[in-house]
């Protein structure tokens, strides 16, 4: 009975870690295939200072840009109880979706008109600006190939050929 309980607790912990955890690569102590070896590349991608692929980049502000802004105004109103004679023009842009209403009496000698347009016919976000360029070294030859691994590697097998610790 105790073995079943231990198996259940370990399986629950494994499921929770695989669902909620961040995979930082594999390997022994940051070496081998999950770290600095394998021709200067990390775990299936770019080694990031001894970490495996994807470790520490999503939550440290490096590769996940986030932009926030205040909420758009929910309404825009123009109200007047004055009497205007002549041509009156009101011009502006309403955010995303807007309505226009004219209330009151128009004399038969004048005209009242509302011109309403919505860009190209689609109501929604029409343009999003980029966040600029990310910080990093833009060397023409790159930093990964022949970096720390460089054909000798840091595997546990001494000077293994590819650095993954397997001795090849």
From Swiss-Prot:
Region annotation Central domain: where it falls in the sequence: 60-128
Name listed for the protein in its UniProt record: Chorion class B protein L11
Stretches for region 4 X 5 AA approximate tandem repeats of G-Y-G-G-L: 32-51
InterPro entries recorded: Chorion (IPR002635)
Single GO MF annotation: structural constituent of egg chorion
Family as reported in the entry's similarity comment: Belongs to the chorion protein family.
Stated role: This protein is one of many from the eggshell of the silk moth.
GO BP, sorted A to Z: chorion-containing eggshell formation
């Amino acid at each position: 009975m105790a073995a079943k309980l231990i198996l259940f607790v370990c399986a629950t912990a494994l499921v929770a870690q695989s669902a909620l955890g961040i995979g930082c690569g594999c390997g022994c102590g940051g070496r081998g295939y999950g770290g600095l070896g394998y021709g200067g590349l990390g775990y299936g991608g770019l080694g990031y200072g001894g970490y495996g692929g994807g470790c520490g980049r999503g939550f440290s502000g490096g590769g996940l840009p986030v932009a926030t802004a205040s909420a758009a105004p929910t309404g825009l109103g123009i109200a007047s109880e004055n009497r205007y004679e002549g041509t009156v023009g009101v011009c502006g842009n309403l955010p995303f979706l807007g309505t226009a209403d004219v209330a009151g009496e128009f004399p038969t000698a004048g005209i009242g008109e509302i011109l309403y347009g919505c860009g190209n016919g689609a109501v929604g976000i029409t343009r999003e600006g980029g966040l600029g360029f990310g910080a990093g070294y833009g060397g023409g030859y790159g930093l990964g190939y022949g970096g720390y691994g460089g054909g000798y590697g840091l595997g546990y097998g001494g000077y293994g050929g590819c650095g993954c610790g397997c001795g090849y």
